[in-house]
Every structure is written in structure tokens, then in C-alpha cells.
């Protein structure tokens, strides 16, 4: 049997956020973002594409309304290190648009990193796996205090049949410090 093309979609949540939200990361979240490039590279190799929601989208956080930059700030260091652009064409609630985009033939043999908001990311992963008759019962809900999980969807494009499988991994970055990095500070 001929092996199909495999598309690997690696989904991460943004880094830690302040109590009031502010659309932003905490220093611990920034430290996570700075550590992510090497973690993701070691686990999945260099991606072909990176996605994050449109940072112009406004979100209501406990501290008020803010532009939602957390996912982009989280994946930005990886994009810089890998020399890749970040596709921000979709708002954080537009998981249908994201799913339609990532199921286009251009992505069939690619590794794609997606940084997003965890509730919508959970919905996206479930919808994507279900669309290829995959088993969604094995997909856990993404917990509110979980910044470390990696949800991975592998779409295998075979002869006449496309399937999707889910697996869960972890960044292993929960023990990072909560002080902001200060390069060059005495």
C-alpha cells in the first residue's frame, strides 16, 4: 500500500497571561515564547508555515478591551528564528476559516505551527479531526491553566481516503522563571 502525504498541524496555546488579561503576556509567558523555538524544532522540525490570529481583533479581558496579541507574541520568536512569516489572516474566533485554509492541497505534506486561544483551539482541533472521521473522544478539553500542552493533528492524504489522528505532547516549559529577560542589564 502506498504511503500518503502527511500534514502535521502543531497547535500551541499562547503563553501565560496577566490576571487582567490586557491582551498581553506576562514575563513568564515571554520566557515561554523565547524558549519555544528550540522545543518545537526538536520535537517537530522546522515548519513550512506558521499561523496566529489577527492581532487587530479586539478581545474583552477582565481589564477591558484590548487587541489580542498573545498568540502572535508567543509564536513570534519561533517565526524569527526559523525565518518564516506568520499568517494572521484569521480572527481568533474564525476557526472555520482556519480549518478551510489548512485543508487546502498546498499544505498536504507540510508541518504547520498554529498558536491560538485555547478554547477556540480546542474547538478547531475537534472540528478538524471530526471532518476526516477521526476519533474526537480521545481529545481532552484544554484546561484554563494549561499553557504547556501541544495538540497535534496528523492528516494523512492517501489514495482515495484522507484520515486525521490526534496526539498530545507537552512543551515541558512550566518551570520557567517569572522575571522578564533583560539582555545587557548589569
Question: Where in the sequence are the language-model features?
Answer:
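Periplasmic-binding protein-like
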Residues: 111-115
Amino acid at each position: 500500500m502506498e504511503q500518503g502525504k502527511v500534514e502535521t498541524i502543531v497547535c500551541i496555546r499562547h503563553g501565560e497571561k496577566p490576571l487582567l488579561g490586557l491582551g498581553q503576556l506576562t514575563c513568564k509567558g515571554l520566557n515561554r515564547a523565547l524558549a519555544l523555538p528550540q522545543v518545537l524544532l526538536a520535537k517537530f522540525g522546522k515548519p513550512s508555515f506558521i499561523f496566529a490570529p489577527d492581532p487587530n481583533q479586539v478581545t474583552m479581558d477582565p481589564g477591558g478591551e484590548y487587541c489580542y496579541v498573545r498568540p502572535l507574541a508567543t509564536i513570534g520568536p519561533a517565526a524569527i528564528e526559523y525565518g518564516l512569516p506568520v499568517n494572521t489572516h484569521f480572527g481568533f474566533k474564525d476557526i472555520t476559516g482556519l480549518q478551510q485554509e489548512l485543508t487546502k492541497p498546498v499544505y498536504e505534506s507540510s508541518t504547520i505551527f498554529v498558536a491560538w486561544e485555547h478554547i477556540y483551539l480546542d474547538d478547531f482541533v475537534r472540528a478538524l479531526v471530526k471532518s476526516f472521521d477521526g476519533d474526537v473522544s480521545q481529545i481532552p478539553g484544554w484546561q484554563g491553566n494549561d499553557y504547556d500542552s501541544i495538540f497535534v493533528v496528523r492528516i494523512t492524504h492517501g489514495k482515495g481516503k484522507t484520515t486525521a489522528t490526534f496526539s498530545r505532547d507537552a512543551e515541558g516549559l512550566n518551570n520557567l522563571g517569572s522575571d522578564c529577560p533583560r539582555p545587557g542589564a548589569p
